């Protein structure tokens, strides 16, 4: 298909999107036919890692369609889906079509429906359609036209290398597709490779088990590493018909680099196997330097961008998750806008984010939110914007701000400005409460207490979340002031700037030791981590009085890094110790203040942990965790190799 998985993902209890097409060229004189093949999509089946979310919106897919035909004489006809004139057939070749589990296709059933797309097809044996009653929790929705780009094929990859049998005598053969991306296989099977009625199994993996003792002792070295797919089966099954067969699933997608084919009489030649790479976006950026490792890093960034921008921005394209995590999206939205034109894509998803926000403007930790609900209850599902904290929530401000600054387009600001005000006002009205060195819990209204439970998630060294979270609070005030000016709300803008100035003063008072310029937490304990300096420097929160010492300390946390991280791995100079909150701020916080030598050394480091370490290990995408794989410890099992 030219467009995949329409009408895409939204928060279906509030928004049902549709796609429009000009079908003039398809209409012919006399009878015409109109039909559709339905898959689970994001409506039914497995949609998250929570078992309770299976069939979250409904337990069967349905079609809502309308065609308006305007004739040259000024008259018109309207054709709609109804429960009388349409028919359906549920014993076709597609036996299972799950985004997470894969597609099961029986080609022997094609003959029974041959010609079904033609107007003269006899559907008298088919079943008359009936209306599917929407669960009451999802019956009050707004029907809207999508304005983002549909998922589509962005390129087709060939096999890089045929790796032979998984294990001798297994009858399973592995092929390396060259890069870890999102897509589906296209497999041509000549008739001499399998008999009609036989089933071919296709499995997928991001990576193979290496020849480390941990894996050779278990005999799994060289096999697909699928444990990080968790409960997602990620397997396609194809039942052969007569003659040459071509299998290309189009109601699922997988995140993978390697495929394993089982069930053929002999190894399939590599030129019989292709990969259709899928994304909502076409990458438009190019990067080339004298350092081949950084060139590959940029290619990896591009792969992870396109792989995770499939209808919504996801955390991973392969396992039982693939959810619109707000923290991940917030962190990467600005960078992603350099890789591709993300404006319409992000604007569309922000509709879902707003639908999941409560009155405070706080977003969910992922959107759609999949809030637990009672099937028997009459109330609409409550959206209270629960998440891990400001690193996740602040997307309601930062994404509209960054996309406006990148494009100059106002729609995304106008769409979100009321929610931005609600969120920033909520932060400002929730005073910081902390435990001081005496064990008391005073409050300070100059800073916010709405910082959450996680901040610099997945860092190698922890940093106080209240301190970092309040930097993001100040940044939200700054950005909200700019956006208020953009929409002509000058009084609001001035109010936010005054609040930000007060918050900056308080932040420096609370979190900087005036004698050493080192950062500290609310108890007065010295932090002195890369994150504790990078984030406040990036967002210009450090006062002029503290700046010189803070820069010296920040530079030292990189150039003189030492010790061990929480995994017992050594920390060496010019390597990273940061996580969600601060990693994206490291280089800006150096280059903005003239520390360019340190910035280049940090960027080009190949030691663990660094941006280039995964590249030296053969990565073709961005790993979720610094310790996704190390030579010393092997794989971290709960890990996406494409985030």
Language-model features, listed with the residues they occupy:
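Extracellular/oxidizing-compartment recognition motifs
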Residues: 1-319, 327-328, 344-347, 364-368, ...
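Active-site core of glycosidic bond-cleaving carbohydrate-active enzymes
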Residues: 42, 324-643
């Amino acid at each position: 298909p030219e467009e995949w998985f329409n009408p895409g993902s939204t928060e279906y209890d509030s928004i049902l999107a549709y796609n429009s097409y000009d079908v003039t060229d398809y209409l012919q004189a006399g009878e015409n036919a109109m039909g559709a093949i339905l898959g689970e999509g994001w409506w039914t089946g497995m949609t998250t890692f929570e078992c309770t979310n299976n069939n979250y919106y409904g337990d069967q897919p349905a079609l809502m369609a309308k065609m308006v035909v305007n004739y040259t004489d000024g008259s018109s006809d309207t054709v709609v889906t109804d429960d009388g004139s349409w028919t359906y057939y549920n014993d076709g070749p597609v036996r299972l079509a799950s985004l997470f589990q894969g597609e099961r296709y029986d080609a022997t059933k094609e003959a029974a429906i041959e010609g079904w797309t033609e107007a003269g097809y006899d559907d008298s044996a088919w079943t008359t359609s009936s209306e599917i009653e929407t669960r009451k929790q999802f019956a009050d929705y707004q029907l809207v036209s999508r304005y983002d780009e549909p998922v589509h094929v962005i390129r087709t990859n060939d096999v890089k290398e045929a790796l032979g049998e998984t294990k001798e005598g297994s009858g399973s053969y592995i092929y390396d597709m060259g890069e870890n991306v999102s897509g589906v296989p296209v497999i041509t099977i000549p008739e001499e490779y399998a008999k009609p009625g036989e089933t071919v199994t296709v499995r997928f993996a991001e990576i193979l088990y290496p020849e480390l003792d941990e894996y050779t002792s278990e005999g799994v070295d060289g096999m697909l590493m699928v444990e990080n797919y968790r409960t997602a089966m990620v397997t396609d099954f194809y039942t052969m018909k007569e003659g040459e067969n071509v299998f290309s699933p189009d109601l699922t997608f997988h995140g993978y680099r390697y495929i394993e084919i089982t069930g053929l009489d002999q190894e399939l030649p590599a030129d019989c196997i292709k990969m259709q790479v899928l994304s909502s976006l076409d990458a438009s950026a190019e990067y080339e330097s004298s350092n081949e490792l950084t060139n590959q890093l940029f290619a990896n960034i591009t792969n992870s961008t396109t792989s995770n921008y499939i209808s919504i921005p996801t955390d991973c394209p392969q396992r039982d998750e693939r959810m619109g995590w707000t923290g991940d999206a917030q962190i990467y939205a600005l960078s992603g806008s350099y890789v591709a034109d993300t404006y319409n894509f992000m604007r569309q998803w922000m509709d879902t984010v707003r639908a999941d926000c409560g009155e405070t403007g706080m977003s969910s930790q992922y959107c759609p939110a999949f809030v637990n609900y009672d099937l028997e209850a009459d109330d609409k599902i409550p959206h209270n914007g629960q998440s891990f904290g400001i690193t996740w929530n602040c997307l309601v401000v930062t994404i509209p701000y960054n996309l406006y600054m990148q494009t100059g387009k106002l729609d995304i600001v106008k769409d979100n400005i009321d929610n931005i005000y609600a969120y920033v006002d909520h932060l400002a009205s929730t005073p910081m409460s902390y435990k001081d060195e005496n064990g008391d819990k005073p409050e300070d209204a100059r800073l916010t207490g709405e910082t959450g439970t996680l901040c610099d998630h997945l860092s190698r060294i922890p940093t106080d979340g209240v301190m970092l979270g309040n930097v993001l609070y100040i940044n939200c005030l700054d950005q909200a002031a700019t956006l208020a000016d953009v929409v002509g709300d000058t009084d609001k803008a001035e109010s936010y700037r005054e609040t930000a100035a007060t918050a900056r003063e308080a932040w420096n008072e609370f979190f900087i030791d005036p004698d050493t310029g080192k950062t500290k937490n609310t108890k007065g304990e010295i932090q002195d981590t890369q994150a504790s300096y990078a984030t406040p420097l990036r967002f210009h929160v450090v006062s002029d009085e503290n700046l010189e010492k803070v820069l010296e300390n920040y530079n030292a946390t990189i150039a003189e890094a030492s010790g061990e991280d929480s995994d017992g791995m050594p920390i060496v100079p010019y390597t990273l110790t940061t996580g969600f909150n601060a990693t994206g701020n490291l280089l800006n916080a150096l280059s903005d203040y003239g520390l360019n030598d340190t910035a280049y050394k940090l960027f080009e480091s190949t030691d663990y942990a660094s941006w280039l370490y995964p590249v030296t290990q053969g990565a073709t995408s961005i790993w979720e965790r610094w310790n996704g794989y190390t030579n010393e410890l092997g794989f971290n099992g709960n890990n996406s190799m494409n985030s």
